[in-house]
């Protein structure tokens, strides 16, 4: 990739000085770069060869690039002058047949799609007027989008709200939000002559239909060098790369949280408004988006339309199916940079990363206990109210989360998909399998920040941490006694219910606690001669 000279320029002087210098330079282009190109054009008319001269002048020689921060410091008048200068420069270069190609991109993605029109060209050549040489500005050579991307320049701004865009096509799409124009209505081009033979969908450009056809052919020309995953579309490929680089360019103005994808930011922003238009009629749970709502409804209906081709297991949503399929391939593409542990899914990696950061932004309103995810906090809050909306159709047992119900259902099916390669032992649940693996590795990944004690299980760490904080969230409704964990509360309740699940095989005597049974069994062993 070509190194951007503006980056080194930025390091040397304050931003205001850089802008002033570049601004003076861009104004000077009307008398330097532009005239040089015109002189070359005139020499061609006189029969002189211009090959050596065009070789000596490139786009970088005659164009001035501003970074996004520098562009923001220019007033509207300066921006308009800059556009006029650059438009003239592009016209002149087009007249002499100058061509621009990003060789790095061509080498990296050969035969992986055509070059796209430069965002700067889109912005500067909105009017299709003719060049002095007789060529139309619409004949300016196509430029690769990466030519402008490194500079951060976004010269297309919305005249209604002032929002700035990299591509003219992005600005056109944005303008529909003001005009309420439907996405499939193309007022700019009118007819859509290119029709897909598979599904009948029509397009304005042949390039658009070629890209669309990949959905039917299954072609995935863009491959990630990090994990080998392939994509049909360039934008999907670029979004995926951010998983490996950790780049989060989209930031919420309300809370400062950053996201990899614009769609994720838009989804997050609705959390601040509190709007949840999709409500489940069965349990009353509300959702911001339709897709999670649809997936949730299937926990009540039992519908599982997505089936694994390997083992026939069915799932309620495609995400669960994709995660499951990796258990067959053994693929774990998501690696923690802190400890090197690998995961099947990106969501699992995100949950794991929080064990290193210690961030627990979600707090129970009832007892004050903090959680790493909103779903965990929501499930926990149900323990206070005794709410268990998810019921097993086999045995009638109820659970406070759909995931617990799904795990429980394996008890009836007897499915044990997770097998230890060390000893061959099989497990119903991936969590039990991972915990078992630590018996071989002796790994204790969970450390108490207060005293440094380490634990094999996260639940043990949480229980231990309460010994420092004194928090006892689990309270007995019978006598009011509080406990640090739910298991201790369950054991305590036997005092009130009289339940004695532990029975002696020798004499049949029953006990409320396993410890009491062990003590009792010793009385039999001592009686033996």
Swiss-Prot record:
InterPro entries: C2H2-ZF_domain, KRAB, KRAB_dom_sf, Znf_C2H2_sf, Znf_C2H2_type. This is Zinc finger protein 490. The lineage of its organism: Eukaryota, Metazoa, Chordata, Craniata, Vertebrata. One of its GO terms (cellular component) is nucleus. Keywords: DNA-binding, Metal-binding, Nucleus, Repeat, Transcription, Transcription regulation, Zinc, Zinc-finger. Belongs to the krueppel C2H2-type zinc-finger protein family. The gene is ZNF490. Residues 1-53 are annotated as: Disordered. One of its GO terms (molecular function) is DNA-binding transcription factor activity, RNA polymerase II-specific. It is found in: Nucleus. Residues 57-132 form the KRAB domain.
